[in-house]
C-alpha cells in the first residue's frame, strides 16, 4: 500500500524505494508503534516519511516541524509541485486556527513551542487526531546554543501522545543519545541509519 502511494505521489506507477533503509523507515513510521530516527543520506527519501502517511491517512493529522525558513520554502515548493495538500501554521492567519480538512501541517520550530500553537494543536486534535510529528534536519537541535535559542526547549513539542519522527542526514553515532535526550524520545526508539559508504 505504501509503495502504491509512493507511485501516485511521484506520478510513476513503477516507483520503488530509494533504498532498503527508506523502506524500513517507512514501515516503522506506518506501524506507529515507536518513535523513529531516520538518518538517511541526501536523496535517500526522507521527505516521503512525512508525505506518504499524510496521503495514506487523511483522517490523521501529520505535523511537519521545520527549523529553518529555507526548509519551509523548500517544503512548500516540493509539496506544491507534487500537488500534496498542506497548510502552514501562522498565528495571524485564520485566527491562529488550523483547518481540519488538510491533514499535513507545516510549522516552524520557533512557533511550535508557543502557547498559540499548543492551543491550535489541542483544538485540531479534537476533530483530526494528530498521530505523528516529523522534525526535519533534527541534528540542528544539537547546535542550538550557537544556532537559535528557540530550539533549546524542543522537547516541548510532544504535547499529545504521538509518534515522533526525526529526519536527518547528519547524525554521527556519538550524537544519537544527545538527540534522543533533546527530544525526549522513548527508550525503544527505532534507529534507521543509511551507511555513508
PLM feature spans:
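Conserved helix-turn-beta segment of the N-terminal RecA-like "Helicase ATP-binding" lobe
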Residues: 71-94, 180-187
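Conserved pre-motif I regulatory segment
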Residues: 1-41
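Pre-Walker A (Motif I) flank of P-loop NTPase domains
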Residues: 31-38, 60-61, 101-105, 162-163
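Interdomain hinge/linker at the junction between the two RecA-like core domains of SF2 helicases
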Residues: 156-157, 163, 170-197
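Walker A/P-loop
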Residues: 32-52, 165-171
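Conserved Walker A/P-loop ATP-binding site and its immediately adjacent core
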Residues: 47-48, 56-84, 108-113, 170-176
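Inter-Walker segment of RecA-like/P-loop motor cores
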Residues: 81-116
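SF2 helicase catalytic motif II
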Residues: 109-113, 117-165
